Amino acid sequence: MLKIPLQLSSQDGIWPARFARRLHHHHQLAYHHHKQEQQQQQQQQQQQQAKQKQKQNGVQQGRSPTFMPVMLLLLMATLLTRPLSAFSNRLSDTKLHEIYLDDKEIKLSWMVDWYKQEVLFHLQNAFNEQHRWFYLGFSKRGGLADADICFFENQNGFFNAVTDTYTSPDGQWVRRDYQQDCEVFKMDEFTLAFRRKFDTCDPLDLRLHEGTMYVVWARGETELALEDHQFALPNVTAPHEAGVKMLQLLRADKILIPETELDHMEITLQEAPIPSQETTYWCHVQRLEGNLRRRHHIVQFEPLIRTPGIVHHMEVFHCEAGEHEEIPLYNGDCEQLPPRAKICSKVMVLWAMGAGTFTYPPEAGLPIGGPGFNPYVRLEVHFNNPEKQSGLVDNSGFRIKMSKTLRQYDAAVMELGLEYTDKMAIPPGQTAFPLSGYCVADCTRAALPATGIIIFGSQLHTHLRGVRVLTRHFRGEQELREVNRDDYYSNHFQEMRTLHYKPRVLPGDALVTTCYYNTKDDKTAALGGFSISDEMCVNYIHYYPATKLEVCKSSVSEETLENYFIYMKRTEHQHGVHLNGARSSNYRSIEWTQPRIDQLYTMYMQEPLSMQCNRSDGTRFEGRSSWEGVAATPVQIRIPIHRKLCPNYNPLWLKPLEKGDCDLLGECIY
């Protein structure tokens, strides 16, 4: 039997094997189920027509028809309409993603066809007896202005009307799209099933992407004039009749754990009193229970959030000390952490608001236990308590699954982005001001193995002002595919995302993480720091094989910043700036005119850096005599044109780059 590789590897990264090949076993499985159950004649005819079309396409493109993805439609119908064996369920579970739109009844399922560049949607319980219509669509940030919506209509018990529409810029009107792209293949009182291309090449449709997408939905009993070119958008306010959900639509297949025997462990706070202040970092140093004399691999971790809305993010740090060395137990504010416990700084697992369970790929796991392993860890939880509530107690933490069967690679976590420092500032009144953190070529050259590392997971992180985050990958003067990008990032939805494309980072490569911030409501500059009112810019990447490099981050160099404040005081006559004063006070005293904002941006983009090329204990790698004054990686400023592959592409479809709607790089995000 021909063996089909699960992955294709290159110097740039790892792609999942060709979509059609990956589905080969699913296609066979669905075929045999259909044969065994002797489906109705109509379904057999549809299947035969699909196979004939598949064969024609395969001959035209030089591919075996067996591997073409047309059977994905039949597979999805099989998964959602009848029970399968346990084996087939395990196979199909990786393809099918699900979410409840109203948290109890209306279930949205979808499958991503990467080969055909389309998504198949399935809705359950969208209608009930009294509903006349249901809509599902996408908007940029959850609002109803300029939304892309498919309307489904029940006409006197006949569920056969669907209309592709878009909303007006004020969100008050619905207009019929001249190009209809909501392709329905099943619609009745229980089920809606339709598909959409990633990019319909329709300027009135939103392009489906791998970042955060906002799904808008509603249903109602009133009759709509869908045959009209324009009608008023129904005003639905009941929570079980309308809503918005954030999700990653174009996501990688789910990962199944191949090991059948797993050990479990919980690392949680123990009755931690939440202080009645806005920001607290709470630390709990504890000794791990269980038999860790034998080496294990962590294969999955699940957040246990006991105080939703207050717990902002959490991390577990391992204490890198001798096997028998005692670390003082502690349960209190991290600012009073015992000095000896500060050795607990190697990141193991982490979570931020909006994230769920994270599963490692079958080839890698996070090492824990074994000879020489110190059993102490530090759980750090960020409490965000803006209302300053008192009397709250928290027991949040993680549930961890481990396997005694070791996998091929040890995995690890690395921090990319900006240092947590007030050397970086964001002027007030900005729509999307960018700050970039660099992992420079000298650092990866000093720290990574010759064959490089494979990044399989990524979690982007900012505080309240972040609106877009991306990490770019450079090899010399060539820019490779981005590691991760979220143009519609929300700090309320900070998923740890398994990457569909897994980049390989080689020694000498550079990674540039850029965060964009909205400070329209701020009166003074926002600064980098730990408080929720400060800002961060981080990409936590999960990768293998593990290295000693844990932090690859930057900030503007001390000398550059000192010269900047001298210039502000002596040339720009900003008399609130004091040359020996606190950086935060200096930034906040500046009157931010547009030329001064441009000067700050230019300084951050072009001037030398202070680099953190650090091991987990804080020591620097020896790749340079000094990591102060390092040249920033040159970043090409470019305006992405997403629809350049459309056959009838018209540049006029792009929105004008009007001031206030776009960032400094000329990219419109709102």
From Swiss-Prot:
The chain crosses the membrane at residues 65-81. The active site is at Y281, H461. Its cofactor is Cu(2+). GO terms for molecular function: copper ion binding; dopamine beta-monooxygenase activity; oxidoreductase activity, acting on paired donors, with incorporation or reduction of molecular oxygen, reduced ascorbate as one donor, and incorporation of one atom of oxygen. Residues 26-35 have a biased composition (Basic residues). Cu(2+) B binds at H461, H463, M536. Cu(2+) A binds at H312, H313, H382. Binds 2 copper ions per subunit. It is found in: Membrane. Present in head and in neurons innervating the oviduct (at protein level). It comes from the Eukaryota. Gene3D superfamilies: 2.60.120.230, Copper type II, ascorbate-dependent monooxygenase, N-terminal domain (2.60.120.310). Residues 38-61 have a biased composition (Low complexity). InterPro entries: Cu2_ascorb_mOase-like_C (IPR014784), Cu2_ascorb_mOase_CS-1 (IPR020611), Cu2_ascorb_mOase_N (IPR000323), Cu2_ascorb_mOase_N_sf (IPR036939), Cu2_monoox_C (IPR024548), DBH-like (IPR000945), DOH_DOMON (IPR045266), DOMON_domain (IPR005018). Glycans are attached at N235, N614. Residues 26-63 are annotated as: Disordered. Residues 104-220 form the DOMON domain. Induction: Slightly down-regulated in adults fed a high calorie diet. It catalyses: tyramine + L-ascorbate + O2 = (R)-octopamine + L-dehydroascorbate + H2O. SMART domains: DoH. Disruption phenotype: Flies survive to adulthood. Mutant males are fertile, but mutant females are sterile due to defects in ovulation. Is most likely a monomer under physiological conditions, although under conditions of high pH and low ionic strength the dimeric form predominates. Both forms are equally active. Catalyzes the hydroxylation of tyramine into octopamine, a neurotransmitter involved in ovulation and locomotion. Functions in an amine-mediated Bacc-dependent signaling pathway that negatively regulates acute ethanol sensitivity. Involved in facilitation of nociceptive escape behavior in response to potentially damaging stimuli, such as high temperatures. Belongs to the copper type II ascorbate-dependent monooxygenase family. This is Tyramine beta-hydroxylase. It comes from Drosophila melanogaster (Fruit fly). The lineage of its organism: Eukaryota, Metazoa, Ecdysozoa, Arthropoda, Hexapoda.
